[in-house]
Regions:
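Long, basic N-terminal domains or extensions that often function
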Residues: 1-247
Length: 247
């Protein structure tokens, strides 16, 4: 089992957009992985004003195999009185890419059964991540330079890793890698992510808390500590706390 990371680094996104963006990002990641028949255990989403990221744990090495069944003409139409295949069943078999002899007879009809072996996950991921990127929706989008593809804000970097292997994704002349941007004032300006599993810890070591709930809790603790120090009571506005969490 592997861990998948996909981070999109942008210019500052509006705080009021962030909860919806991260919810949409998580749902898209889960939906696209399921549609691609790539088993996974859990998807977690992370965000700061300049980044959105998801980490999918327990990613299987290969797609699940698929069996598809197509119902064809009735046996009365498929074969003549002597049991020879008619043009109807020959056309059906040809359209399904199978021989007439491979058709299954059941319940008075013929069926084409096709088995498709699952592909290798890392081969499928570039297209899947590109699909997620282009499927994200926002209250408003921006276009920049001469690019046709718009986004909530211009994006300047992407990190896409399956464990420690870079998954190639490219959009608007930005190519994925294993390097993210650091805090504007603290720590390194560029940070190498050694593996998808180490994403959260690596950023925290560089003064970036990408876990939204952890960041909100820390802000609350600091507000309450200041209030207690001043000998007062802190009346915290939850809406304001939510906004500050994304600033």
């Amino acid at each position: 089992m592997a861990t998948l990371l996909y981070e999109i680094g942008t210019e500052e996104m509006p705080a009021q957009y962030m909860p919806g963006i991260l919810k949409n990002y998580k749902e898209l990641a889960e939906t696209k992985l399921k549609e691609a028949r790539i088993p996974f255990e859990k998807v977690s989403v992370y965000g700061t004003p300049r980044r959105m990221a998801f980490v999918a744990e327990g990613i299987a090495d290969r797609q699940e195999d698929m069996t598809a069944e197509s119902k064809g003409p009735s046996l009365k139409i498929a074969f003549d009185a002597d049991g020879n295949p008619t043009k109807a069943v020959q056309g059906f078999a040809r359209g399904q890419g199978v021989e007439v002899s491979a058709l299954e007879k059941r319940d008075g009809y013929v069926y084409a059964i096709k088995h498709t072996k699952g592909g290798e996950t890392k081969v499928l991921l570039p297209a899947l991540l590109d699909d997620i990127l282009h499927s994200l929706s926002f209250p408003k989008t921006m276009r920049w330079a001469d690019y046709d593809f718009g986004f909530v804000r211009p994006f300047h970097w992407m990190v896409a890793l399956l464990d420690s292997e870079v998954i190639p994704v490219e959009a608007n002349d930005v190519k994925s890698g294993n390097v993210t941007r650091g805090h504007r004032f603290l720590g390194s300006q560029t940070i190498t992510i050694p593996s998808a599993e180490a994403y959260v810890k690596t950023l925290e070591e560089n003064f970036i808390i990408v876990d939204v709930e952890k960041r909100r809790a820390l802000i609350r603790e600091q507000i309450e500590a200041l209030g207690k120090k001043a000998g007062g009571h802190t009346a915290i506005s939850e809406d304001l706390l939510d906004e500050v969490t994304y600033l």
